[in-house]
């Protein structure tokens, strides 16, 4: 498959029109109606704090904004400063005819005031000029819906229309590879990444870097950037969010360059200026490439620079948060830097778009949306993966590692969690708490009550602990926020507790995390990239709260593995092979009927008999687990679950059998009839291909050689390999015939 420029235009125009339509429907509504709905609120400016936070007084009778919500702050002139004069004006009409100035705004906190009729609201992210006007005139400000990034999409449309640019054509006009080219070199925390990249860039113009959770990519990008500035290079760093730019600018390696006035930032806000007084403002957001200087710009701004410049302005262009970039924005970097570095994570959240999922699937636009994934899978640039996580404990890294081919290693100083709360695993990482959750209910009262109590318990043990309570859904978050405030003695949620949707916390690090999965629209909560973000925020423990039958839902293989790992104390066996014990008749409250069964050729009486089931067996006999029965241990290789998921995409496969098999496997896991095992390819003899699926399955059997592993497979080649290694095998046909005879 090959995309045409028209494919890109069609997607970008569809997204543009979708955002316009949604925003248009909102802002053409009467402003007073929006205020009644809580989509507009007004506040009188009180003061600007030393840290750049603007304080506003808002009537408690109005609907309060959500904490950490984004708005557009509008200074309406004349009589329109009072909402009582808005009459039938729409929000759009008010802004068009009476707006004196405006700024982006973030509601950082809400608290009570001395006057019981009002509350105080803290606002961040105000533009410097807007904040100066507030201090001078102390007006009433109206806060309305955040403006969508329409200009960003329009910039990208212009970029894909330019067919004469060879550098962008090298990416935009690609053909999908038959298989992924992504085979990154792993870089450990002790290695000097900057020197490695600089050496590579002597002969290459592009590099892709994957930074899994907590691997210190921002720190390492700051180190690289400081070396480039020391060499008098012009450097651009661009990210989706201004917050990510500030986190980079605050790193120690860049401090001397910031203090020397060699770092500028676009769209500077008053609180950013207070945080870094020596960080220079790019007053007009114009491209300002210069030798020995660093320019910090958001995607919104840098996409405009790429559109307007025919000559490449920067020596080096670095994109952080590349996983949040559409493919045309990924491509735009080729117009901005002679040397380009993309840094991101394909396994975390992709860009959020408004276009309907059906349209995306019908036209195959997912490759355009997931730009960094497409780049990594289809282009043979030098590629690296940061493999050591400073955030996650060893147990947590092994769980999150399922999203990274089990390549993630912990170098965290925290490996043991001291707590009297039984649910929190002492080795850190995830715990699963299953409840009876009502189907279709986004805000289950029993789960929310449990969450509030758990947060209170953690805070009572450690008052300074940082906690994130996350959900996919806004309604769930809003109800948890309300319930927490009602259950506590404060009138606000403290700063060390963040109750938020998952899409708002990428990059966040906390001590504890709670992720609630309502028993409604579960496929959205279990979406692989979102689930990975939600469950990798914590330095200590993560608690997943969901319906106790969650594993019966469809989900990716990685998410299923993670959930099984989270419950290892209950029923999942991973790395410990069984110890052989002598057989014999045992009576422990009941008779072991297996002693009186007709002898089966694969069974060894004086050893533990373990059936390892291959993929082809489930395809042809989806009820194989019940046919084996409960008298014998059943192990399902993780690779088998992965292959079953992939088979669903093949039109020639009986989907009914696959669905029955999946349901039976889930039931067996939930009821402890069977367990999953990832195997250990290090047990394979030399000459065996460790990436071969059959060999991965065979490695599971090798882990159980202390007992009598029985490989149930109809694959003749796999049977031969197993027999050569002393593993008992039986085909499905032989197994069924044996039980009929």
Residue ranges and their predicted role:
Residues 1-86, 470-476, 482:
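Accessory interdomain/linker segments of ATP-dependent helicases and helicase-like nucleic-acid enzymes
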Residues 231, 239-243, 300-303, 308-319, ...:
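Conserved helicase motor core of SF1/SF2 NTP-dependent helicases
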Residues 220, 224:
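Hydrophobic positions on the alpha1 helix immediately C-terminal to the Walker A/P-loop
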Residues 2-13, 61-202, 250, 261-263, ...:
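Pre-ATPase regulatory/linker segments immediately N-terminal to the P-loop/RecA-like helicase/translocase core
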Residues 243-272, 483-490:
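Conserved helix-turn-beta segment of the N-terminal RecA-like "Helicase ATP-binding" lobe
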